């Protein structure tokens, strides 16, 4: 999945390697969508789910968490439950790692190192569901 630069805080395109499990869930979700363009549609048919919708759903469910907190949970899981490379886990979150000089030389997207992380994360999430 490609997140366009204009949607990213860093204004740089971010490629997210989706696991087979996530791709299957997205394919399954299509049947509930009212749009060919969006998998998750909002209240207005054919329009995407709004930016604040997930937060509103969590609030409705009386959950004491935020969408951004999911990122923290992922990072903590990577650090405490896996032995994945620090740089690769940071790249999963689209974090800039190292000094400006190091960043100038690290130009790859690390997709081959990030894919197994996302596969294992999907399995972990599914095991808790």
Predicted ranges, named:
Residues 66-67, 109:
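Residue-level "hotspot" positions that anchor or transmit function at local structural transition points
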Residues 2-11, 23, 46, 83, ...:
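Catalytic-site neighborhood detector that most strongly recognizes the C-terminal catalytic loop/helix
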Residues 7, 12, 17-65, 73-74, ...:
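Active-site/catalytic core of tyrosine-dependent DNA strand-transfer enzymes
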Residues 1-3, 16-18, 89:
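Short beta-strand motif preference
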